[in-house]
Regions:
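SF2 helicase catalytic motif II
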Residues: 82-84, 92-137
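Motif I (Walker A/P-loop) of helicase-class P-loop NTPases
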Residues: 1-6
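Conserved Walker A/P-loop ATP-binding site and its immediately adjacent core
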Residues: 13-37, 260-261
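Loop/turn-to-beta-strand initiation segments
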Residues: 15, 74-77, 100-103, 125-129, ...
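Interdomain helical connector at the RecA1-RecA2 junction of SF1/SF2 helicase-like NTPases
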Residues: 141-250
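Conserved RecA-like P-loop NTPase helicase motor core
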Residues: 112, 275-393
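Inter-Walker segment of RecA-like/P-loop motor cores
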Residues: 40-87
């Protein structure tokens, strides 16, 4: 809403391009614009049935013909997915339009640092606004720099602590649940760590030789992803989830899973316990997704299991708790997951966040100790961010201290 107010400070002849990562976010923006400016014209670019070229062409004709643009009475918004907005056809469509008539809003702007989306930065807009709860891309300083070059530095920041104090987000308690890697899982994690160290050393040597910063290679990123996946899918998480399931008596809980395989493991547990649940996956039809959200909203089901697609932006029905099974060291992922449960229509509500924290096995050989320490540090970095805004932070800090002492970490 704030970005729409900002966009309306420009003349009505200024066309507003709004870029978003997913189609559901296009739908949300469309709903907000219709409520905010009922007389506006909205062109959708990026959905299956989109005919944006036919719709946008006549809109841009007066700009190309040097017509009297002061006569324009209604604003035009172009809602598009990042994939469409970075397409050369879309970028070229704006080439002969003076930049003073174009403003661009990027929702979840961190996505635009990806190499295949950076073509968006060739749209010459005079006014630019980037939105993100987590604007920095992890392990991608090159992509971060590209975003800053186009949008400039941060102009306004509003953190979660302040939002909770101001009553825009609900208070919450944080509950870490510890899952231990088995020997085989940690050995694989250690092997990838050693391989990654070698590749990063080569990368730094190359940067030093060329005298400039370079984006990480695809191979290094793949190693990072493979190593992260071992933590996300640690087998002990399923048992921890089962124990949690048997001890909890809450309703309307979000469960964040890594992939379909992990989701199926959790579903088998829910079937045993008799708890009611629905799924929300990217490969579902929109009608199925909407049905799942509606059932969850009405309280017809106790749990909503999701794979990543609820991480960003999408408005999720009010819920009392979330379980992060697919725990991650990506600041963007866990901050956005926390945000899903803190949005509230009831200011008196206190949300509960259950986070499965992965720790190394006790039985490791001396040469693996550095990798074990680094792993627990990365997990604790996430835990610290979660704890710092929690109502029960004193109790949690004591619990974590005792757990780490027990594992001699």
């Amino acid at each position: 809403i704030t970005s729409l107010f900002a966009s309306n400070t420009a003349p009505k002849s200024t066309i507003t391009i709004i870029c978003v990562p997913t189609v559901p976010l296009i739908q949300q923006w469309e709903e907000e614009i219709k409520k905010f400016d009922k007389l506006s014209s909205i062109i959708i670019a990026g959905t299956e049935k989109s005919n944006w070229k036919e719709l946008l062409g006549p809109k841009l004709a007066p700009y190309r013909l040097n017509s009297d643009l002061t006569k324009i009475q209604n604003r035009t918004y172009v809602l598009c997915t990042n994939k469409t907005a970075s397409n050369t056809d879309f970028v070229n469509f704006w080439n002969d339009i003076p930049s003073k008539y174009i403003q661009l809003i990027a929702d979840e702007v961190h996505h635009l640092g990806a190499p295949d989306l950076q073509n968006i930065f060739n749209i010459n807009s005079s006014r630019r606004l980037a939105l993100s709860a987590t604007p920095e891309r992890q392990w991608d300083s090159y992509g971060n720099q590209k975003i800053l070059e186009y949008f400039g530095k941060t102009v306004f920041e509003y953190d979660i602590k302040q939002a909770i104090r101001d009553g825009f987000l609900t208070h919450y308690t944080y509950h870490p649940l510890f899952a231990e890697m088995n020997i085989d899982e940690f050995q694989e994690y250690y092997n990838l760590t050693q391989e990654m160290k070698q590749e990063i050393a080569k990368h730094k040597q190359k940067e030093k030789k060329l005298g400039k910063e370079l984006p990480l290679s695809y191979f290094v990123k793949r190693l990072l992803e493979q190593r992260a996946l071992i933590k996300k899918k640690t087998s002990d998480k399923v048992k921890i989830f089962e124990d949690w399931c048997n001890s909890i008596n809450q309703k309307q809980i979000l469960v964040f899973c890594e992939d379909t395989e992990q989701m199926e493991d959790l579903i088998s547990i829910l079937n045993k316990t008799g708890k009611r649940y629905v799924n929300y996956k990217s490969d579902m039809k929109n009608s199925q997704k909407n049905q799942s959200l509606e059932m969850f909203k009405k309280g017809e089901t106790e749990l909503l299991l999701a794979i990543r697609c609820l991480d960003e932006g999408l408005d999720v029905p009010d819920c009392s708790a979330c379980v992060i099974v697919s725990s991650s060291t990506s600041i963007r992922e866990f901050v956005q997951r926390r945000g899903r449960v803190l949005r509230t229509t009831n200011r008196d509500k206190i949300a509960n966040i259950y986070d499965i924290v992965v720790i190394p096995p006790k039985e490791i050989i001396p040469e693996q100790e550095d990798a074990a320490d680094a792993m627990i540090k990365s997990e604790m970095d996430r835990v610290k961010i979660m704890v710092d805004c929690a109502d029960n932070q004193t109790d949690v800090k004591q619990e974590i201290g005792e757990k780490l002492q027990y594992y001699e970490l």
